[in-house]
Amino acid sequence: MHSFTRKLFLYHTALFAGGFGAITVEARTPTGTVSLAYIARLYSMKTKLFGKKVLMENKYNKVEIETNSRRAYINGVMVWLHAPCRKHGNEWTIREVDFKGSMDPILRTYAYAPKRMPRLVVLDPGHGGRDTGSISPKGYKEKEIVLNISYKVKKLLEAKGIRVKMTRTGDTYPNLDVRSTYAYKVGADLFVSIHANAAGASSASGVETFITASSGYDSTNMYGQDQDTFAFKNNTYDAMNSVLGFSIHSNLVKMSKRDDRGLRRARYSVLKHTRCPSVLVECGFLTNPHEESLLNSPSYRELVARGIANGVLGYFTLIKRSLR
Ligand SMILES: [Zn+2]
């Protein structure tokens, strides 16, 4: 047994000792990677290669991974990998960090969930005051739209008995450090920053959700560019960031009916410094004519708010189940 094989073997045994019983399969892949065949065996999934995708499926879940790509789909929802799925010998592999920190927490939340129910949600309406955020061609301001959506999310969550606080309640600008510090001071159990997108091309459309990139890997929106890849306080929550991000993103896509741009990774200040599971949602593009009018309409804002609130409620339900 080569030393890297031994290390991987020990890691897998430790990781799955609870959920799967002792695993005695050797993974013959390079250190830091795990083969899709191996993952499929762990989940008792059937595997097939379909065009450029590897499909893995059991009775409960379906995972699709594009080969030589960072795109993966978990139960139909796009999740960006930190690094592309690559072939080593005969095996398609992904990085261990994407399996251990993302796919497995999403599929087996009970093995990662905190041992007590979350109590307080902090919502962070982006921008405010002198910082308007993006401005649409017709002059709609991101700071106003996201404050309105945040109030709708607050109302929906409070109707379900969940405590909610906001980093701003009016047209003010708490700086980015103040927002993370506020969440910590009030004892936030989860943090959701709410934004609207802008792009140079008016064709760009859809919704996307960000969580902190794992240490050592690029942000998905700055892939291959020079950037820091250090660990931050929020990386302690990598697994639950994925669970919260996936729950919110899948509900956001479902309710908004917009294009799915995926659950992505970025070291945004309000994510990386926040000391609880944290997510940043982009509710559509102010630079896309159709989405500009949607973002200006109360009915679309309500749908987006429902998507976010349902995602938070879904996260609460997953933790509640894991505590039984
Ligand atoms: Zn913004």
What is each of the regions a protein language model found here?
Residues M1-F4, G19, L323:
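Compositionally biased regions
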Residues M1-S3, R28, R41, M45, ...:
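Solvent-exposed, well-ordered amphipathic alpha-helical segments
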Residues H2-A14:
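N-terminal secretory signal peptides and thylakoid transit peptides that target proteins
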Residues T5-K7, T31, A37, E142, ...:
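Short, cationic motifs built from Arg/Lys/His that form the positively charged side of catalytic pockets
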Residues F20-D131, I135-K141, N148, L156, ...:
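Primary recognition of N-terminal secretory signal peptides and signal-anchoring hydrophobic helices
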Residues Y140-R324:
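Active-site-proximal helix/loop segments of hydrolytic enzymes
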